[in-house]
Design a protein with these regions (language model features):
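Catalytic phosphate/metal-binding cores of nucleic-acid and nucleotide-processing enzymes, i.e., regions
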Residues: 1-121
Length: 121
């Protein structure tokens, strides 16, 4: 069973940012809220069912590519929010496996696409 959810958010690498803690907190809160609301809408859709273990592929869409370390780091708040909605710890590799990708978007286009793959009952 495969489900695809797209979040219209801009992710940034947390590793290279030098900013005030309040700005970082605001960005994290906005990302988490956007993901949680979109996930709740998706979960209520007919036919939506998640069976564990689930394989989640997060794809960053943006005008420029990040190096692999920064790409994975940019999903921190997205991953935390998805795990929260699924009711699991994001570090529980027996129930959730995470994969990170990125693809080039149009100028000014930012989004995250999550693909959930699980074996149905």
């Amino acid at each position: 069973m495969i489900h695809v959810v797209k979040y219209d958010i801009q992710t940034r690498s947390e590793l290279n940012l030098r900013e005030h803690w309040a700005a970082r907190h605001r960005r994290a809160t906005k990302q988490k809220q956007a993901v949680v609301w979109t996930m709740y809408e998706a979960v209520r859709a007919p036919g939506w069912k998640i069976y564990f273990p689930v394989y989640v592929t997060l794809t960053r869409i943006g005008p420029r590519a990040l190096d692999p370390d920064n790409c994975a780091c940019s999903f921190k708040h997205v991953q935390d929010a998805i795990a929260s909605v699924l009711g699991v710890d994001d570090g529980d590799t027996k129930r959730v496996r995470w994969t990170y990708k990125q693809r080039k978007g149009m100028p000014g286009e930012y989004a995250v696409e999550a693909v959930f793959k699980c074996k149905g009952a």
